[in-house]
């Protein structure tokens, strides 16, 4: 005789013992008849199986009781009177009897809800999902398709199974193309996206996008400007018509231009009033490439923004927004449809202009320099505020001179505009003085240091796999911060995280990075520590960087390759990233490498490849930037680094 214990389901918690006869019991559709004063029927509630088939296929008779023992000559059970959540029952074979179950029930409570194992009546006939693995595996695998229009516009698209498509307009233009006279023009062109055109007002454009768009954004960088949207497939043509209108019929009204210039200036002040990663990156690019090309800052100075006019915007638009510089990328649509629509709305754009520079001509002027730059945190912003204060004071003096030279106004004249301007100037001067005082009282508690080395550009992907090796090395070094939510897949077992971040609570952040550009990239390590610990943190970083070549293992390499592949594949699951990825490939080297091809290249990376890359990077002239909390904070310069490497080259790179 078998004794089995069952946890009482919540639906039975209010049931008392009574007589229940369960007739026609089977595993598929049990029918339960409740005999009590308030008789109720329960059908198809298969909370548990009440039948056990033994080897003789005999039917069982089951007797259930609560808080009582069922004794037989062959078994015994001690009930627990305090345990109200268990049922005990015994089973015995009887070839002559059918299944019978008896209980004593005083009152019954039946759930009004449909059981979870039964399809809701309103969903009957609806196919919610498919478990047919074979059907899922037989779905057509879509590949990226590339075409070029007669005017040079390149179109890349990839069909998907989604009902949403991502659309991106990418222009081969950015701050690397700017001259000293038009610094900030491409940043302002980005800010003027979705603004008034000859055909629509700004409010109309925004309203239309709000009604159809899931996501809309514009961004600019050193080598590219892009506008991207996510919409339902049915709205693809409408979005392309909006994008076409933006680059063929803008008005760039003076009022909107002034507004966006103020936005850019506020962004500049926000970035320079910190020791943020973006500020470090901007300074680093200037150290690495000088004051032109890739060395041009993505954010211009307030004075440079103030010099931008409508004419400069139109000139940049005419010169760079040409067919050979444009790539249109779409996911979630048929390629033939995309080609037809792009030709309809963009087919009249000229291939080029006489004064349009080629990317090769710009890249030929880019040379890596290297060196060192250091400053005290907040000093850049403080200097900007002081120069702004001086400018306002000079403007105030000129205004007073103008007022003295003016003739007296009649008593019944309107309020003099100069009086209002003077009041605004006085207010702005006082606010600037307060900002300078607050900045001087501000105590910075962290110092940052960054070192970077020249690396192969994206245009070399067809020739070698240096970029792929750099991605794997980045994952191998990894990094992290002193505060982390944890969890797998975050590189917590990487070198920099284990041996630098975890070495001291005074290390706030340390990570490896790879800034990829067309001709030349930058590979490096960034470090942030508490004030007074920067020198110790730099020693930890150099120890990991210079000793990595001789100490890394095959296991670390395989983990880094898996991590890099998972990051790439996970990011490409987002339609916007996939759209962006295809366009960047076309802009950089004219073709598209699928995720499968990239993963195969990552798998082919060997220990020797990484060792050669480390030797090449470590022995090149670095670019070093430090933003320290105070002037007495010791730092490491590029010259000092080169001296350390030279003295230890025989042991480090043998």
Curated annotation (Swiss-Prot):
Coiled-coil residues: 381-446
Record flagged with keyword Methyltransferase: no
Gene Ontology terms, MF aspect: endopeptidase activity; metal ion binding; metalloendopeptidase activity
One term under GO cellular component: mitochondrial processing peptidase complex
GO BP: protein processing involved in protein targeting to mitochondrion
Disulfide bond sites: none
Oligomeric and partner information: Heterodimer of alpha and beta subunits, forming the mitochondrial processing protease (MPP) in which subunit alpha is involved in substrate recognition and binding and subunit beta is the catalytic subunit.
General function of this protein: Substrate recognition and binding subunit of the essential mitochondrial processing protease (MPP), which cleaves the mitochondrial sequence off newly imported precursors proteins.
Protein's recorded name: Mitochondrial-processing peptidase subunit alpha-1
Organism: Dictyostelium discoideum (Social amoeba)
Gene from which the chain derives: mppA1
């Amino acid at each position: 005789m078998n004794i089995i214990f069952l946890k009482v389901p919540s639906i039975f918690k209010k049931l008392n013992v009574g007589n229940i006869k369960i007739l026609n019991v089977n595993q598929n559709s049990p029918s339960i008849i409740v005999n009590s004063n308030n008789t109720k029927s329960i059908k198809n509630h298969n909370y548990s199986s009440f039948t056990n088939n033994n080897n003789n296929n005999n039917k069982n008779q089951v007797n259930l009781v609560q808080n009582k023992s069922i004794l037989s000559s062959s078994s015994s059970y001690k009930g627990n009177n305090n345990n109200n959540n268990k049922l005990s029952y015994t089973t015995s074979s009887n070839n002559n009897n059918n299944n019978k179950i008896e209980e004593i029930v005083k009152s019954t409570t039946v759930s009004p809800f449909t059981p979870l194992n039964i399809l809701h009546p309103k969903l009957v006939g609806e196919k919610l999902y498919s478990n047919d693995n074979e059907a899922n595996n037989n779905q057509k695998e879509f590949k990226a398709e590339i075409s070029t229009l007669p005017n040079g516009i390149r179109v890349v698209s990839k069909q998907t199974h989604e009902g949403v498509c991502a659309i991106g307009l990418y222009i081969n233009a950015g701050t690397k193309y700017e001259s000293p006279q038009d610094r900030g023009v491409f940043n302002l062109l980005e800010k003027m996206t979705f603004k008034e055109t000859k055909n629509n007002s700004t409010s109309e454009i925004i309203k239309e996008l709000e009604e159809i768009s899931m996501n809309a954004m514009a961004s600019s960088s050193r080598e590219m400007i892009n506008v991207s949207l996510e919409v339902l497939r049915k709205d693809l043509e409408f979005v392309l018509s909006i994008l076409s209108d933006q680059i063929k019929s803008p008005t760039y009204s003076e009022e909107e231009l002034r507004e966006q210039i103020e936005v850019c200036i506020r962004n500049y002040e926000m970035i320079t009033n910190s020791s943020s990663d973006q500020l470090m990156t901007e300074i680093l690019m200037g150290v690495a490439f000088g004051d032109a090309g890739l060395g041009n800052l993505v954010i211009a100075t307030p004075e440079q923004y103030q010099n931008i006019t409508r004419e400069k915007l139109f000139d940049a638009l005419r010169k760079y927004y040409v067919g050979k510089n444009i790539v249109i990328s779409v996911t979630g649509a048929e390629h033939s449809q995309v080609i037809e629509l792009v030709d309809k709305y963009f087919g009249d754009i000229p291939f080029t202009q006489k004064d349009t520079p080629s990317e090769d001509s710009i890249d030929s002027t880019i040379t890596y320099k290297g060196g060192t730059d250091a400053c005290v945190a907040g000093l850049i912003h403080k200097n900007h505020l002081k120069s702004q204060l001086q400018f306002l004071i000079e403007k105030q003096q000129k205004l007073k001179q103008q007022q003295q030279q003016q003739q007296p106004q009649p008593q019944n004249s309107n309020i003099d505009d100069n009086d209002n301007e003077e009041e605004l100037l006085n207010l702005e001067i006082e606010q600037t003085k307060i900002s300078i005082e607050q900045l001087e009282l501000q105590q910075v508690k962290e110092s940052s240091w960054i070192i970077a080395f020249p690396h192969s550009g994206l245009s070399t992907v067809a020739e070698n796999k240096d970029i792929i090796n750099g991605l794997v090395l980045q994952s191998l070094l990894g990094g992290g911060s002193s505060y982390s939510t944890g969890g797998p897949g975050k590189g917590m077992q990487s070198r920099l995280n284990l041996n630098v971040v975890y070495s001291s609570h005074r290390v706030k952040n340390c990570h490896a990075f790879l800034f990829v550009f067309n001709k030349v990239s930058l590979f490096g390590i960034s470090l942030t520590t508490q004030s007074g610990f920067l020198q110790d943190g730099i020693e930890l970083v150099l120890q990991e960087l210079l000793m990595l070549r001789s100490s890394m293992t095959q296991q670390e390499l395989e983990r880094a390759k898996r991590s890099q592949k998972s990051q790439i594949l996970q990011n490409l699951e987002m339609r916007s990233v996939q759209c962006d990825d295809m366009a960047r490939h076309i802009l950089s080297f004219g073709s598209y490498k699928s995720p499968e091809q990239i993963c195969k290249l990552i798998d082919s990376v060997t220990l020797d490849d990484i060792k050669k890359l480390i030797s090449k990077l470590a022995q090149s002239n670095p670019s070093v930037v430090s933003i320290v909390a105070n002037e007495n904070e010791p730092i490491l310069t590029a010259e000092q680094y080169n001296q350390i490497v030279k003295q230890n080259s025989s042991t480090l790179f043998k």
